Regions:
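Polysaccharide-binding surfaces and accessory modules of carbohydrate-active proteins
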Residues: 5-13, 23-39, 49-279, 295-297
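Conserved, mostly hydrophobic/aromatic
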Residues: 36, 180, 304, 350, ...
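Active-site-adjacent "subsite" loops/lids of carbohydrate-active enzymes
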Residues: 345-347, 354-358, 401-404, 424, ...
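Hydrophobic faces of well-ordered beta-strands that scaffold small-molecule active sites
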Residues: 346-352, 378, 382, 425-429, ...
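Catalytic domains of carbohydrate-active enzymes, especially glycoside hydrolases
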Residues: 364-387
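An active-site-proximal structural segment forming one wall of the substrate-binding cleft
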Residues: 371, 375-377, 465-495, 523, ...
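Acidic/aromatic-lined carbohydrate-recognition and catalytic surfaces
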Residues: 388-441, 529-533, 537
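Glycan-recognition surfaces
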Residues: 435-474, 518-584
Length: 584
């Protein structure tokens, strides 16, 4: 297990109309070995990273034969030395836009002259024990005894764009993770138009594509279809991972079932707009890619600035889909979920929402708690309606102070009475939202996500707060902290009940407006991280209109996620089954 690096001088044949002629290539090979998995790629002497193999563990001193270095007279090549680097057929490790690879690229960057050609070449590499954290992002973690990491640094000499490809192989699991770090080492600004986190080129198309699709109350239903020529994929453009598509795909052999066959699983550790696709080419090769959705995306990199792309988890199994699922489960339990509740039994809780909706007061909640305690239920969660003047869903989001008309005696009195019954107490927040009818909106209408001069689209009688703005996050955190410090609260249900529209920010300059999609997600992560750091004993459960944000990014902050608003026993079987294909 671990990372192996070797160098070779090889001779290949150039195919042409006049017969085959030999050509020489210097090759640097990288082999990443997990328990039963090998991942192999190489650097040829013009600096391109060429993928070789991903699958069942292999041995051998010289694996250069795995690299697909083919000449094809109908497609562009990058030099006049006939070295076989034909762009549209090579299996690239991290393909770029503009130099003749017409398949789906991972990277497209516009320079200060408006040109979008990007040409990354190998510059250096380093290997070290352990796994680095990703600044501002959720990611799997490992100490020096649990994993080994390879960083490949590539450079576009024309623009000064540096890309660091980060690979981590885990010692005890068939898992390899990938992420990308960009840096503008030049003098002129660059605009990142597309930055995916992962590409794997397969040398055949003999797979089925598995996705997790659905809708509200029907999340993550398994869909399986045979690959065909062209592009098949899923995405989200809603500002969250969504009810409709989950940031997970798998490529499995046609005969794969729970116990037999090959399965390649890919999961994006991210909670915003994503893009995942499998593309079958004219040669019946397959390219799988995954990362941040490039739709309506742009990120300005001034000189010296960096951008960190989220992580993709790659899992291989030659023992069917079931082994792939169990590997994801083991990884996330051991190396993603954190905090006191990582391995701790979660309390059995009762939530008042379906029983009362907005029509409750202190006495009614205590009555529910008394009956629940007789049944052995361990926690009462007070849901929507306890704050501002919230008697319906058309007011008070953002006003996170106690509605004393309902909670006569105050929050601490209610919590103390519930605690006397031997029960814990939890509370509902929707921290990302703001109601037009709220003290906060009347004071700070500019804090809503908006396009100046355009009417805002209403959804569930609410707008979305601009979490790219630190002032907004600080205010919301201060309000939540005051509530949490006022009583013995041991659980938070964090809800999100609408998606993003009119995506603009009053706090960002014109040339950074398209960054809002991603900056919003980073802001959510920032606030969740502050909560879990300052209140480590509180169990944070994520919810989004049911299961619209059930993803690995959320698992990093909330060890418990509401799976769906559909709790019908039969319907829930499909939802639980689909969810369990990737998530524990």
């Amino acid at each position: 297990m671990g990372i192996k690096i070797q160098e070779y001088h090889k001779e290949y044949l150039k195919k042409s109309w006049n017969g085959d002629t030999p050509f020489d290539v210097d090759v640097k090979m990288f082999q990443l070995d997990a328990v039963n998995t090998s991942y192999v790629f190489g650097v040829i002497d013009d600096g391109y990273l060429v993928h070789g193999y991903f699958g069942k563990k292999i041995c051998g001193d010289d694996l250069t034969y795995l690299l697909r270095l083919e000449e094809n007279p109908w497609v562009p090549k990058t030099n006049m030395r006939d070295k076989g680097t034909f762009m549209d057929s090579a299996a690239f490790e991290y393909p770029c836009h503009g130099t003749g690879d017409y398949r789906e690229p991972c990277l497209m960057v516009m320079d200060d002259e408006g040109m979008t050609t990007t040409d990354l070449r190998y510059q250096s590499h380093k290997v070290y024990k352990g796994k680095p954290a990703l600044e501002g992002l959720p990611a799997t973690f490992a100490n020096e005894n649990e994993a080994e990491t390879l960083e490949i640094t590539c450079i576009d000499k024309h623009t000064g764009l540096e890309a660091v490809l980060v690979y981590t192989v885990f010692n005890d699991l068939d898992v390899i993770t990938r992420s990308v770090r960009l840096k503008n080492t030049g003098k002129a600004p660059l605009n990142v138009k597309r930055v995916l986190s992962m590409c794997v080129d397969f040398d055949n198309d003999g797979y089925d594509l598995i996705t997790l699709n659905g809708s509200w109350a029907r999340e993550r239903v398994i869909e399986r279809s045979k690959l065909h020529h062209g592009k098949q994929g899923i995405d989200s453009v809603k500002g969250e991972s969504s009810h409709q598509n989950n940031p997970f795909i798998a490529l499995v052999s046609h005969n794969a079932d729970e116990d037999c066959g090959e399965a390649y699983g890919f999961n994006f550790v991210y909670s915003g707009n994503f893009f995942a696709q499998a593309e079958v080419t004219q040669h019946k090769y397959t390219r799988a890619v995954m990362g941040i959705n490039h739709f309506d995306f742009n990120w300005l990199l001034e000189a010296g600035e960096e951008f960190v792309a989220p992580e993709v988890v790659m899992v291989y199994s030659d023992e069917g889909i079931g082994k792939m699922s169990r590997t994801f489960h083991d990884l996330y339990r051991q190396h993603l979920i954190r905090g006191e509740y990582k391995d701790k039994r979660r309390p059995i809780l009762i939530n008042n929402w379906e029983a009362t909706y907005f029509n409750f007061d202190t006495d009614k909640l205590i009555g529910i708690a008394k009956e629940a305690s007789k049944l052995g239920i361990e926690m009462l969660v007070m849901d929507d309606g306890w704050f501002g003047h919230r008697d319906s869903d058309n007011s008070s989001l953002g006003d996170w102070f106690v509605y004393e008309k309902k909670l006569n005696g105050g929050l601490k009195y209610l919590v103390d009475e519930v605690n006397k019954l031997g029960m814990k107490f939890g509370i509902w927040f929707e921290p990302e939202m703001i109601s037009p009818d709220s003290e906060l909106y009347r004071k700070h209408p500019e804090w809503a996500i908006q396009v100046r001069g355009r009417e805002l689209t209403m959804s569930r009688e609410q707008y979305v707060l601009d979490y790219s703005n630190k002032e907004v996050r600080d205010y919301v955190y201060g309000m939540m902290k005051a509530v949490l410090d006022s009583a013995n609260i041991e659980y938070i249900k964090w809800d999100m009940n609408r998606q993003l529209t009119e995506v603009g920010s009053t706090s960002l300059p014109k040339n950074r407006q398209r960054e809002l999609w991603h900056r919003y997600v980073l802001g959510v992560y920032d606030l969740m991280n502050r909560l879990t750091t300052d209140y480590p004993h509180i169990l944070l459960e994520n919810c989004s209109g049911g299961g619209a944000r059930f993803d690995a990014g959320m698992l990093y902050y909330s060890p418990q996620i509401w799976c769906s608003d559909d709790t019908d026993a039969i319907e829930r079987l499909k939802i639980q089954h689909g969810t369990s294909i990737c998530y524990p």
